[in-house]
Amino acid sequence: MTLSPPKILLIIFSILIVVVSQSVAQDTEVSFSYNRDLRSDEVYDSKNYLTGDWGGIRGKLNNLGITPIAKYYTTILGNPVGGKKKGVQYAGLLNAYLKFDLEKLLSIKRSKFIVSGSWATGRSLSDEDIGNFFTASEVFSGRSVRLYQLFFESELLENFLRVAVGRMGIADEFSTSEIFYNYVSTAIDAHPISLAINDAAYFSDPQASWAARIHVTPTEKFYIKAGVYNSNPAVGRDSAHGVDFSFRKGVIVISEIGYLHNQKQFSKGLRGRYTFGAFYDTRKFDELASESEKQDGNYGLYWIVEQMIYREMTEDDQGLTPWAALTISPDESINTFPFFISGGFIYKGLVPNRNYDKAAFGFAYGTISDDIKDKDYELMLELTYIIQATPWLQIQPDVQWIVHPGGSSDIPNALVLGMQLVVDI
């Protein structure tokens, strides 16, 4: 018997509901979201910000339940070897958030309201000079000022259930990991790039769409979450500035199940996280071999594994953590990358007396659909080092080697050199 994609997802949802219904709620330390700038469990400390406490104003706002957050990301990258032509490009992204603690403000227990915006500048080295799929800088997000997030989130039943509704990016919560944010290339940061290449409505920072999601934590080690997101790539265009509030085209239905262990601080065991997810998009997709032909629906699967294998004795989170991610989007008639795999490792505290620095290696490899002629695969290798210069400043020199840019040997393999700066304003 052949199962259609919707039936496959229905079976997955049914299994998850049964598991949840037979479980008992317990406390957990999982944060609200993997969004790099928003952490519900983060404790306010003015020393972590470039602008400090604003003469006491920032601390007073935080006590009232209003937390302003702003981070600036910038990359300066060049390709001295290979690509379409040699070049150097700058990209910048300013993200600004207001987080309202509704329990403090309105006595609505365990609830928050988030509104955020972004200002994206610069140019893409990959688009302008290299010609590859796996764009070298995740910071480049077009050139636009836009509204980003606008959503309400609430914890229920002592954190057994979290519910969110509003404007959100799908990859802020699904198919992502904190470990991905240690990289510069979009191939890895902030989620496997194949998902967004195959489905242009698979939004991440700073793009968002109307959505609703739930997150259930039946045990300390297990979670399941599901969401419905508007599937309309046009909503994310630069000229809309994030205020195209229409709901058209279709929806992405997504679910993710995860197993976590040794997540608590000072846990004796080594931390690990294992994730599986599946999604189905109901809108119409252009066929790759003929743009005049369209197909109803698209679906994909993903797996993410990260497991610490060595921990230093001095600090809880210093040590070596390998990771891997895999995505499969079986329909080659509409998916540019039907198969994609990435992986690598992070070592925190590798250099003596640099306990907060991180060294990272990563790779990403994707096979290209047979329906796209004269293209077969693209490979990216990245070596990077994050220098935690101050509590509010990261300096990150970065090296990338891009093989088969654009999926063929027509463009010479490219060497990318440069750095990323992150300022917590």
Residue ranges and their predicted role:
Residues 26-28, 45, 52-68, 101-113, ...:
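Short loop/turn motifs that connect adjacent beta-strands in outer-membrane beta-barrel proteins
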Residues 262, 267-286, 291-370, 383:
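Detector for outer-membrane/organellar transmembrane beta-barrel domains
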Residues 413-425:
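Outer-membrane beta-barrel "beta-signal"
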Residues 87-233, 335-371:
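Outer membrane beta-barrel
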